Each structure stands twice: as C-alpha cells, then as structure tokens.
C-alpha cells in the first residue's frame, strides 16, 4: 500500500473507508512499497492518527501508527522525537485521567518510535511504578534504558560531557578542601611547633599562633581568593606529610593543572551548542527534520556549494522529511560534477529503490561494489544490493551479496540489520555523516562550520595548540608557586630536621626539644613509659597517662566530626590516606553530579515525568558512603616497638667469668 493511499484512507475516517482499507492488498513478502516524489510527512501521518483516535476508529489509528513505523524504517530515522513527544503528551493525559494501562501503551509507543527521547522512557518508568510493588523492577529497567539510549545520541553525548566536566571540577574542589582540612588538623600542629621553636620563648605563644594564621590565610590576605586555600595549605604542610599524604597532595595539584584544559573543552562544547547550524545538522542525522531545519541547511549549501558535507546533510534531511524528488535532485547534481561520488550514488539508488526502480538501483549498487571502493562503501553497496535481489526473489544472489557485506564490515552490517520492518524485511541504508562527524565538523564554532568536506577525508585541526594555550593560566602558575613554597619550607626546617606528633600523647616534638633517639614515633616520656617501662616517676606517669587519655579522646572526637561532616576526611586524618581519598571521591562525586545537573541538565525531562530512581540511587550511595566512613576507623597511629633487652649487671657478669 502506498503512503498516499494510506494517508487518504486515514483522513476520511469513515467506517466504510476503514473497512475498505482493510481489504486493500499489502505487498507480498520481500517487496517494499514504492514512495511517491513527495511522501506524507510525519506531521500529516500524526494528524491522521490523532483524528482517527479522536473519532474512536481504533483500526485507522493503528494503521497510522504502523505507517509511521514503516516510514521511519524506510527513511533510516534513528529517533522520531516529534512524534515521540506527541505520544508522551498523550501518555501524560492518560496518567492524569487515572488510565494507567493506556498511558503505558502510549509511552511504549513513544519509546519504540523515539528510542533516543528520554521523556518516553521516563514516562514509562512512572507508569510502571503505578503498578505497585510488581512494577518497581520494570520501572528501574525503563529508567536505566532511558539513560543508556539517550547517552549515544548527539544531544545526550554533549550533555553528558558537559555534566561530567562540571561535576569533576566541583568534586575535585570539594575533595581538595576536605583533604586540606584533615591534613591541617593532623599536621598543622607540627608547623606551629616549629614556629614556636624558631621565634623562641621570648616571643610567646600568641606571636607564633598569629604568624601561623597569617601563613595559612595569606592567599586571602593578598586578595587572591579563598578558593586557593586548600592547595596553599597542602603546599605549606608538604614537608610534614608522609609519602601517602604527599602522593595525594600531588594528585590534587595535578588535578588543578587539568582545570584549564577542562574549562577550555567545556567552553568549546558550549560554543558549539550555540551554533544553530550544528543543531540543524544533528536533526538531519538522527531525527526527522522540519521545514526550518531544511531551510537552514539550504541556506548553508547556497553559501558554500563546495562543502559536500552540507550537501549530504541537506539530501538526508529532504529524504527523511519525505521530499524524495528534491533529495534525488540534490544527489543528481553531485553526480553530475563527480560521477564516482559513492555517497550520492548510493543514496540516489535508495530513493529509486523506495520508488520501485529496482533495476536502476541495482546498477548503482553494483558500481559501489567495484574494486577500489572503501570497505564501508563496498559493504553498504553489497548489503543494499542483496535487498534488491530479495525483491526479485533471487535468493542465491541475495546470499552471495549479503555474505560479501558481512565479510567486508561485519560490525557495520550488524548495525544495518536494526532497520527492519514489521514484516521482518530489511530497509536499504544511506551513507553520510555520523554523529561524530557532525560533532567534529562544528566543534568550537558559534556560526558556520569548523571543517569543510570532512566526508572527503579532511581532518579537524589539531587541538594541541589550544591545549597548550589552555595550560597557561593561574592554575599552572600556582603549581610552580606551591612547589617553591614547599621547597622553601623544607630549607627553612633544614635537611636533618624532624617534627613529629607523639603517637601516644600527641605532643609535638622536634630535634631541638627532644633528647635521645626517636623510636616508634614516641616522645621520650612515652617511650620510657610504654616501651622501657622504667625511668618515669609515679606523678609523671599519672600526668602522662592523663595526657594520653585526653589525646585519645581528642582524636576520636575529631574523627567523628570529620567523618560526619565529610565522610572520608576522618580516615585521612587518622592515617588511612588512600581509603579516605576513595570515600571522599565517592561522596563528593555523587554530590557534584546532583549539583551539576541543576547547572547543566543531562536531559530536559520535566520534573513530573522524572522517576525517583536516580535521586533515590544517589541518596542510597551517599548513605552507604557515610555509613562506611563512620563505621570503620583506623587503630592507633603507631605500634609500640619491641622492648629492648636488659643489660646484664657487671657483678653478675664477673661472677659468671
């Protein structure tokens, strides 16, 4: 049945006409319907469906949907977003009317016709959730399917990259603050102790404390901004950190160095998203373009007729809009200039195939299988040629051509097999630009194109220069400045200096104030009290035990506070550096995604259609991280060294001699 006949039948919407439509013979298996020069648009088919549904003619409405599905396959349209949004609107109306099953059917139809539209998947998830407990798992699957289907699309990939970039920047900023705060609490007293020793007893504690605060807040005091404080603190304390803490600090400094390129790439994508021609090209590649899109592409072709990419996009847009005659004329003009143009030859043959001109299509497909053709072109030509043989019931030739296509490009042919009619027959496939080609063609341009004739082998300009330019910023300068600061602090302390916190009482001690050799990270009194177990008077023992108890209580309280406020920071404070960093990455990563989605939304699904699973999953992940961070804590910072062997008394040694 031709599309024009179907449209006429649907527009009449009378019982007699509907009955007559049922009696019209459908094409035999393997024979594709022919297309007129101007086929029905999807707007016309959708209007026919709406009228049939409003008239209560279920048969005509079903026929309209089948024709929409058939036309989508014939024109190789990945996602009918316009029709999908119409079905989503109907599903929402059914949900408001408490007609859950009808709403589910509408959303399923939207998912089938527009798999790249997240609204249909979200609406289906909401409708399934209204089933009750038995609809929970299918609802989660529908929501996950919506994300996985939208992600490969042009808009989905662009939104995902923007969301990931913003979330990564926010997460690194939060992690840097948490790590700097934990290490400041853990190691800041060592710097304060060295300042005390450097100023001497004549200056008093208040002078060293004031100098300590001035050093910590120097970026704010010099009007550089409070955002630099985490990296400044890490550089200031770098000489006091152990190797694990230094490794984490270096990772954060490297992340700061990557801020410039990340922001530059985000700016490039945002400039691309402001290009109206980019959105027109994207619609021509993965949707059914409307008249405005076609007009914009026609204007672009008129301004640059030598850019074949724009010509291919215009031809694809015209064919997917049902304007077969105009699309054929576009390809004929290309072939008049270059008879060997593989894209124009294949796509013109597909239009002839849709019109029933199998012999002329066969001749053009065979030209594409000649020696010297690119593998993807030859595989596509063999694949389309096999369908011509199938129309003629030439099964041996069909199998031979299909085998050649599978041999040349098995992955490509497997992708082509998704274009399958309800009758289980396959559709011929166009050649042209992919989503990735469209992204590269318009990358970084707010108007016009960035690369001409990408399909002819032109490559995008190298972004090495732009990457190098993005590294010249304050963040790169800060890395050098902080390296200099860490070096100066190390030179100020001296090469043989050490400053430690006693692992038991928490007292800070250094080379100047410590007598004897350091063993096990303990001060002299704790070493004699807990290891030698001798040489400490009773009152001193009692005072030291009270200090140990206060230090343990202080460490436990600080661990709880840090873990409650910033899960993972407590582990960093108590010495589980890498485990704490992993918890911080999970905590701030989830939080950053939630915040970034408000700034650069991944999808445009309205809130009323958004299922609760993604926020609920994020909440459960945050709860799990918080529970783990507060449940598991490190033991003491140090283990006591072995007790030294007692020396034999001189008298006993002489008697033994």
What are these regions (language model features)?
Residues 449-495, 499-504, 519-560, 578-657:
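Transmembrane helix recognition focused on a "late"/terminal membrane span
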Residues 242-288, 490-497:
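Hydrophobic alpha-helical transmembrane segments in integral membrane proteins
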Residues 96, 130, 320, 354-355, ...:
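Register position in tetratricopeptide repeats
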Residues 65, 107, 143, 297-298, ...:
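Hydrophobic/aromatic packing residues within the alpha-helices of TPR/SEL1-like helical repeat arrays
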Residues 60-73, 264-355, 360:
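Membrane-interface segments at or immediately adjacent to transmembrane helices
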Residues 72-80, 116-123, 135-138, 145-161, ...:
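Boundary/linker segments of alpha-helical solenoid repeat arrays
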């Amino acid at each position: 049945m031709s599309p024009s006949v179907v449209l006429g039948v649907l527009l009449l919407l009378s019982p007699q006409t509907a009955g007559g439509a049922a009696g019209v013979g459908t094409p035999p298996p393997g024979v594709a319907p022919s297309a007129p020069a101007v086929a029905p648009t999807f707007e016309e088919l959708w209007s026919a469906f709406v009228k049939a549904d409003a008239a209560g003619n279920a048969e005509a409405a079903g026929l309209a949907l089948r024709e929409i599905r058939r036309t989508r396959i014939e024109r190789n349209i990945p996602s009918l977003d316009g029709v999908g949004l119409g079905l989503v609107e109907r599903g929402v109306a059914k949900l408001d009317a408490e007609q859950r099953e009808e709403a589910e059917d509408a959303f399923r139809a939207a998912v089938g016709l527009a798999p790249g539209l997240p609204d249909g998947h979200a609406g289906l998830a909401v409708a399934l959730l209204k089933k009750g407990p038995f609809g929970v798992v299918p609802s989660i699957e529908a929501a996950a399917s919506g994300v996985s289907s939208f992600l490969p699309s042009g808009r989905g990939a662009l939104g995902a990259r923007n969301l990931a970039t913003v979330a990564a920047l926010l997460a690194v900023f939060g992690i840097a603050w948490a790590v700097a705060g934990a290490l400041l609490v853990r190691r800041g007293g060592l710097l304060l102790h060295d300042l005390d020793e450097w100023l001497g007893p004549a200056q008093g504690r208040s002078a060293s404390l004031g100098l300590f605060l001035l050093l910590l807040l120097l970026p704010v005091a010099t009007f550089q901004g409070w955002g630099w404080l985490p990296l400044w603190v890490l550089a200031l304390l770098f000489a006091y950190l152990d190797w694990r803490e230094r490794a984490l600090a270096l990772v954060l400094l490297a992340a700061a160095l990557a801020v410039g390129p990340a922001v530059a790439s985000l700016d490039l994508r945002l400039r691309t998203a402001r290009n109206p021609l980019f959105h027109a090209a994207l619609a021509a590649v993965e949707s059914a373009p409307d008249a405005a899109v076609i007009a914009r592409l026609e204007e672009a072709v008129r301004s640059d007729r030598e850019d074949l990419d724009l010509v291919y996009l215009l031809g694809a847009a015209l064919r997917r809009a049902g304007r077969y005659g105009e699309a054929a004329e576009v390809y004929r003009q290309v072939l008049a200039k270059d008879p060997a143009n593989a894209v124009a030859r294949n796509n013109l043959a597909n239009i002839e195939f849709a019109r029933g001109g199998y012999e002329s299509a066969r001749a053009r497909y065979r030209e594409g299988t000649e020696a010297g053709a690119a593998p993807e072109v030859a595989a596509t030509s063999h694949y389309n040629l096999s369908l011509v043989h199938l129309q003629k019931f030439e099964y041996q030739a069909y199998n031979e051509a299909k085998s050649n296509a599978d041999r040349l490009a098995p992955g490509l042919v497997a992708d082509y097999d998704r274009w399958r009619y309800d009758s289980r027959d396959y559709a011929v496939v166009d050649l042209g630009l992919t989503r990735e080609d469209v992204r590269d063609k318009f990358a970084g341009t707010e108007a016009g194109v960035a690369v001409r004739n990408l399909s002819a082998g032109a490559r995008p300009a190298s972004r090495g220069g732009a990457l190098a330019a993005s590294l010249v910023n304050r963040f790169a300068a800060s890395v050098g400045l902080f390296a200099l600061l860490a070096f100066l602090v190390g030179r100020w302390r001296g090469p043989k200096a050490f400053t430690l916190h006693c692992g038991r009482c928490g007292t800070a001690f250094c080379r100047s104030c410590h007598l004897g050799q350091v063993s096990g990270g303990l001060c002299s009194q704790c070493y004699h009290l807990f290891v030698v177990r001798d040489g400490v008077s009773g009152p001193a023992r009692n005072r030291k035990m009270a200090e140990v108890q206060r230090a343990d209580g202080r460490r436990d309280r600080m661990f709880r506070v840090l873990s409650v406020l910033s899960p993972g920071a407590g582990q960093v404070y108590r010495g589980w550096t890498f485990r704490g960093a992993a918890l911080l990455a999970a905590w701030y990563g989830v939080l950053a995604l939630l915040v970034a989605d408000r700034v650069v939304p991944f999808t445009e699904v309205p809130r009323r259609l958004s299922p609760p699973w993604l926020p609920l999953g994020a909440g459960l992940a945050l709860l799990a991280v918080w529970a783990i961070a507060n449940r598991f804590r490190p033991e003491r910072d140090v283990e006591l060294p072995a007790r030294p062997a007692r020396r034999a008394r001189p008298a006993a040694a002489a008697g033994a001699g």
